[in-house]
């Protein structure tokens, strides 16, 4: 999983039109996910595999409590595709591990901005691997967005920076963040495949369970015993991640994804502020410039999808006898 990437696509069909409520829930969920990332970054001496375990295992608590309250707990474990969940778990755990590792090497806003490449990469992989039709406008937006990623990464990559590099640790962190975004895109494509037969709560529950189990495979790589403060931060990160997941799910009940999705970029503002106040991270000009390019291209893709959806709806209405 990438740094702020949600563990699965929990979007639901809109049940009642209340865009303002949906937007509010989305923004609150962003606060929870940013808080989660902040807590994880504050435990920098903890191995990323160990972070994945705490983030996944303790996210189960609010999710299962919510499903029990709604009377949907029994549905969460009914699956027709167990191997599909395992595959999604493997890719998701790898993405999360790389993303959390990047958090320990990069400023918080920079790791967040690189993560924004995920939806752009989904467009590319969907076209190349699934044969989805992508028009000129979306390709242009994707290419521009990837230019933004390069703008952010360039100063970090020592092999290309010609002596002006900012350190080997940052270079490794930048590459880890990029690979996390790539794997996150594949994870989202796996989720897209699962939603044809699986309930939303099933996908989410099995991911947290599989991630908790798979992360234990990193034990031989050297987990450490956390201090009480670190343990509190790790447990808090998991709990906040689970609550953020529920809030994000609820937001899509009240408005279309095309309305809600742009507010994900509120996280950039939050991480810049938190990074400066808590971690003394001063945003660099390449990071800010690249982030603006990525956000602009991402919003362009979202709006384009919305316009196409409206056009398809009008065409359908016009053809209805």
Predicted regions and their residues:
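Membrane-interface interhelical linkers
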Residues: 1-28, 60-87, 160-166, 196, ...
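Juxtamembrane helix-loop-helix junctions in multi-pass membrane proteins
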Residues: 32-59, 186-210
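Hydrophobic/small/kink-forming positions within alpha-helical transmembrane segments
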Residues: 30-34, 64, 89-97, 119-124, ...
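Cytoplasmic-side transmembrane-helix entry/capping segments in multi-pass membrane proteins
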Residues: 22-26, 79-89, 134-147, 173-174, ...
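Juxtamembrane helix-loop boundary signature in multi-pass membrane transporters
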Residues: 1-25, 123-178, 182, 295-321
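Specific transmembrane alpha-helical segments of multi-pass solute transporters/efflux pumps
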Residues: 32, 71-109, 115, 151, ...
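Helix-helix packing/entry segments at the starts of transmembrane helices
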Residues: 111-117, 194-210, 245-276
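C-terminal transmembrane-helix exit sites in multi-pass transporters
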Residues: 99, 118-143, 269-288
């Amino acid at each position: 999983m990438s740094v702020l990437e949600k563990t699965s696509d929990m979007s639901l069909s809109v049940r009642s039109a209340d865009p303002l409520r949906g937007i509010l829930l989305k923004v609150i969920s962003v606060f929870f996910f940013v808080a989660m990332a902040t807590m994880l970054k504050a435990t920098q001496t903890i191995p990323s595999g160990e972070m994945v375990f705490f983030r996944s295992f303790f996210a189960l608590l609010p999710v299962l409590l919510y499903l029990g309250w709604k009377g949907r707990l029994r549905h969460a474990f009914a699956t027709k595709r167990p191997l599909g969940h395992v595959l999604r778990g493997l890719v998701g755990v790898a993405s999360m591990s790389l993303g959390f590792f990047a958090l320990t090497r990069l400023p918080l806003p920079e790791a967040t901005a690189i993560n924004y490449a995920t939806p752009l990469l989904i467009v590319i992989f969907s076209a190349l691997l699934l044969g989805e039709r992508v028009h000129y406008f979306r390709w242009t937006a994707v290419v521009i967005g990837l230019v933004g990623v390069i703008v952010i990464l360039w100063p970090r990559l020592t092999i290309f920076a010609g002596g002006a590099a900012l350190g080997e640790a940052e270079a490794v962190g930048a590459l880890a963040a990029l690979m996390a975004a790539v794997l996150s895109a594949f994870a989202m494509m796996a989720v897209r495949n699962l939603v044809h037969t699986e309930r939303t709560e099933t996908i989410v529950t099995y991911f947290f369970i599989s991630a908790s189990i798979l992360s234990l495979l990193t034990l031989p790589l050297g987990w450490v015993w956390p201090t009480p403060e670190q343990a509190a931060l790790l447990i808090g990160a998991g709990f906040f991640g689970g609550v953020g997941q529920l809030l994000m799910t609820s937001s899509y009940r009240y408005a279309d994804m095309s309305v809600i999705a742009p507010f994900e970029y509120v996280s950039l503002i939050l991480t810049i502020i938190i990074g400066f106040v808590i971690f003394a991270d001063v945003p660099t000009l390449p990071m800010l410039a690249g982030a603006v390019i990525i956000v602009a291209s991402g919003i362009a893709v979202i709006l384009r999808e919305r316009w196409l959806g409206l056009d398809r709806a009008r065409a359908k209405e016009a053809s209805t006898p």
